[in-house]
Swiss-Prot record:
Residues holding ATP: K9, F57, R85, T91, R102, N112
CDD domains (alphabetical): NDPk_I (cd04413)
Assembly description: Homotetramer.
UniProt cofactor(s): Mg(2+)
NCBIfam families: PRK00668.1
Keyword tRNA processing in annotation: no
Reaction(s) catalysed (UniProt annotation): a 2'-deoxyribonucleoside 5'-diphosphate + ATP = a 2'-deoxyribonucleoside 5'-triphosphate + ADP; a ribonucleoside 5'-diphosphate + ATP = a ribonucleoside 5'-triphosphate + ADP
Organism: Streptococcus uberis (strain ATCC BAA-854 / 0140J)
Protein name: Nucleoside diphosphate kinase
Gene3D superfamilies in alphabetical order: Nucleoside diphosphate kinase-like domain
Family annotation (Pfam families): NDK
Length: 144
């Protein structure tokens, strides 16, 4: 059974979308293996977004991600990584199809180019393992 890391970002938590997102996960037939509401630290965010540190939008991204609590968790199921990414929709809300989480709930980039796109999901088994270990290290991060 494949596992992946997911996150409901500060805008999703603030707008009361936790129940909607979790309901979509469960209706899809995936299992919620872990859930935790956390206030992210700068250190966790720097590690999580390490590949984006040189981007011009990075400071705004970190400010956004530290603007409130996030819900983090692990979901499992057959081909859950690819399926969850499809359920989320394209990163940019303007490109996300209706019926996806981002298509239905995310907000277009503001005048500073900052997106509030509600959710995150690992993009590969390696990323899932790394992100589960980073955020929920007390759990097993094995992806069989």
């Amino acid at each position: 059974m494949e596992k992946t890391f997911f996150m409901i970002k500060p805008d999703g938590v603030r707008r009361g979308l936790i129940g909607e997102v979790l309901q979509r996960i469960e209706r899809r037939g995936f299992t919620l293996d872990a859930l935790q509401l956390v206030t992210p630290s700068r250190e966790h965010l720097d590690e999580h977004y390490h590949q984006l540190k040189d981007k011009a939008f990075y400071p705004g991204l970190i400010d956004y991600m530290m603007s409130g609590p996030i819900l983090i968790g692990v979901i499992s199921g057959n081909e859950v990584i690819e399926s969850w990414r499809t359920m989320m929709g394209k990163t940019n809300p303007k490109d996300a199809a209706p019926g996806t989480i981002r298509g239905d709930f995310a907000q277009a980039p503001d005048e500073n180019g900052e997106m509030m796109n509600v959710v995150h999901g690992s993009d590969s088994r390696d990323s899932a393992k790394r992100e589960i270990e980073l955020w929920l290290g007390h759990l097993t991060a094995e992806n069989k």
